[in-house]
UniProtKB/Swiss-Prot annotation:
Homotetramer; dimer of dimers. It is found in: Cytoplasm. GO terms for cellular component: cytosol. The lineage of its organism: Bacteria, Pseudomonadati, Pseudomonadota, Gammaproteobacteria, Legionellales. This is 4-hydroxy-tetrahydrodipicolinate synthase.
Amino acid sequence: MFNGSLVALVTPMQENGEIDYSNLKELVEWHLENDTDGLVILGTTGESPTITAEERHKIIRQVVDQVNKKIPIIVGTGANSTVHTIEMTQQAMELGADAALIVTPYYNKPTQEGLFQYFKTIAEAVPIAQILYNVPSRTACDLLPETVIRIAKCSNVVGLKEATGDIQRVKQLKAEDLDLLSGDDKTAMDFMLAGGKGVISVVANVVPKPYHAFCITAVSGNVELAKKENDQLSPLYDSLFVESNPIPVKWALSQMGVIPKGIRLPLTPLSERYHAKVRESLQQVGIKC
């Protein structure tokens, strides 16, 4: 159902922090024209913690209407409140999204049983397709494979975004009826070659067409070509993470003329000492800026 290059889309903002809805429309069109396989909106890269309820509604509605079922739209709906997560997941479904991406609760530090009950409760409350999201580096909470297997018994839990970079987890879970998606660009090739279906990618923001081709190659199991394409993209794997995501990728896109320069506090624009490194990596992958 969900596979290939699924871009973790940035939310374009003006320098005063206001969302640029006109530019968002242009950005979505750019991805449609450049073979992106799906859009993941209002996730980590989309600065979801700083987006208001009114803005969420407007963003989801605009993107759903524009895409018009050409490619899947996945909306980040996770929070550390079960009730709030259910509300946002319900909203995504009502506005026409294809799936919800639900991160493990952050700050609360639930047990594995707590995680099971949390995801089971949401799955039973809202019938939209749901993708679990495990990113312990941000949440201080690790969704273990044995817990994923329990949650996967819910019929509308259809996938897992695994951002630990642990390839063994793919091998443990590939027998399950789940779309396994990497959430870590640096290890995405090995993830897909081990049985993953695709990537929810930060890097795909700046190189959508090459990243789509790379995902097709890796998912098909063409090891030699996948390594070649991965090497071509590799300058971005470090440079786009020199500071907290999405700081570097938004700066890169602004340098490319794709989006304005805005980002919301507590995130700040890319530190000047990293400008040359990010610019050089863009040039290494053939982007003029």
